[in-house]
């Protein structure tokens, strides 16, 4: 297929689908660093003009990393529903965009079509969307899942209670969990990034968090975000695991840099289904983020947005309870400033929902990025309007272990009140029962961790 157009008297030609996708991407410092970004705004617009005319089937024919050499590609391609794909393969990317945004296209129609898509199709249509398009398109799609409660229901906004501690102090973590719970944070998960990845330390944190959940009869789940092999061993030893976690990348080589592969994830999923203490049927938790493959020198010339879309295609194999992009965590080398972080957050959320997974966002930034807490609050409002399933909850938005800034316990409570949303229904009923919430609003008892020391 000839990938060529003329714009303002200049001819632009692109050598491959991979190159076209990269040139059509919004400005990202990571793509610029990789040497694959459009040289000018005019070239970017020319690439989008060409991309809009590409049939979806061509994007399936030419994945950014060949089927023969990459197991992520194989997972995505082999998972396509061929009946649905055959119905839509003749659509151009531009026609697909118009269909997604049309008032006559409902969320259940999009959920059905998602089963006939590949990651490259999802990435391509995302590149043709404005920020408002991404918000509106994502708002149509509801992706629910269930562990001990149901996430993703219309009218709800969940929060991960993230009580990280620089030394994994059980006393410090317990106090932080209580503070988060007192603000209504923790309905998606009580999830800890451990400093110590050893099995014994992870088991200690699993037992402590499970004890809190059991003592207070909290309708939620726990998760310790250690390497998946550590969690697998903890499961084998009988630890009370609610969700099994792993960070994912969009290429086989990048996942190998993370110390994982599809066979390992398959084994972890099977163990989770057999031994997790949650009711299920969804037991997995994944985190993602644009730029991870580039940081591992494993991008194979593909742009970071397309590789991110491929992560969601891999995640879908495991019917996860929740997935979130950690959108500004890697730093300004990949997303330079608030403009790029905001764009990537909206892109990732839209692509996750279009893939068909329960999607949240860690709206965050590092201290050397050109971003502030106000920018993260702005992104959180936009994502909430887009129907984001959950955010992180960190004391005052400052993670003392990971040394980055994100959303606070207060932020989710404010977003719920601002936009008329509620916690997950089982969790809200629990908050009401213990006196921390009434009619969807926190009571005077909220915000005081000592409430749980009675």
Regions found by a protein language model. Give the residues of each.
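Anaerobic metallocofactor- and corrinoid-dependent redox/one-carbon enzyme cores
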Residues: 1-174, 182, 187-454
């Amino acid at each position: 297929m000839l990938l060529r157009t003329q714009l303002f008297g200049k001819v632009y030609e692109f050598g491959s689908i991979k190159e076209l996708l990269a040139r059509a991407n919004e400005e990202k410092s990571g793509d610029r660093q990789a040497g694959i970004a459009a040289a000018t705004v005019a070239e970017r617009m020319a690439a989008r003009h060409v991309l809009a005319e590409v049939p979806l089937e061509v994007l399936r024919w030419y994945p950014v990393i060949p089927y023969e050499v990459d197991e992520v590609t194989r997972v995505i391609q082999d998972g396509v529903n061929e009946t649905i794909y055959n119905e839509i393969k003749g659509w151009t990317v531009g026609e697909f965009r118009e269909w997604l945004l049309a008032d006559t296209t409902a969320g259940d129609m999009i959920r059905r079509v998602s089963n006939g898509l590949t990651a490259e199709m999802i990435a391509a249509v995302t590149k043709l969307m404005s920020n408002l398009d991404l918000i509106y398109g994502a708002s149509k799609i509801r992706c629910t899942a269930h562990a001990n409660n149901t996430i993703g229901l219309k009218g709800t906004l969940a929060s991960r209670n993230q009580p990280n501690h620089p030394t994994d102090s059980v006393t410090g973590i317990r106090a932080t969990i209580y503070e988060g719970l007192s603000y209504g944070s923790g309905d998606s998960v009580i999830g800890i990034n451990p400093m110590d990845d050893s099995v014994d330390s992870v088991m200690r944190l699993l037992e402590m968090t499970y004890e809190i959940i059991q003592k207070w009869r909290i309708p939620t789940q726990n998760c310790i975000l250690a390497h998946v092999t550590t969690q697998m061993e903890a499961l084998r030893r009988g630890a009370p695991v609610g969700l099994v976690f792993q960070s994912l990348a969009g290429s086989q080589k990048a996942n190998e840099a993370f110390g994982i592969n599809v066979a390992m994830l398959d084994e972890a999923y099977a163990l989770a289904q057999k031994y997790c203490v949650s009711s299920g049927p969804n037991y997995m938790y994944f985190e993602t983020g644009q730029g991870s493959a580039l940081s591992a020198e494993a991008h194979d010339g593909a742009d970071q947005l397309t590789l991110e879309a491929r992560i969601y295609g891999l995640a879908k194999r495991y019917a996860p309870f929740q997935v979130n992009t950690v959108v500004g965590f890697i730093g300004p080398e990949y997303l330079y400033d608030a403009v790029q972080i905001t764009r990537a957050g909206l892109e990732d959320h839209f692509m996750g929902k279009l893939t068909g997974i329960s999607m949240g966002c860690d709206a965050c930034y590092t201290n050397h990025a050109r971003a502030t807490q106000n920018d993260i609050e702005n992104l959180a409002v936009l994502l909430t309007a887009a129907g984001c399933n959950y955010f992180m909850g960190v004391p005052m938005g400052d993670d003392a272990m990971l040394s980055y800034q994100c959303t606070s316990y207060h932020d989710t409570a404010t977003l719920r009140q601002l936009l008329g949303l509620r916690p997950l229904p089982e969790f809200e009923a629990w908050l009401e029962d213990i006196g921390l919430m009434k009619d969807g609003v926190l009571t005077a008892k909220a915000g005081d961790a000592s409430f749980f020391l009675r």
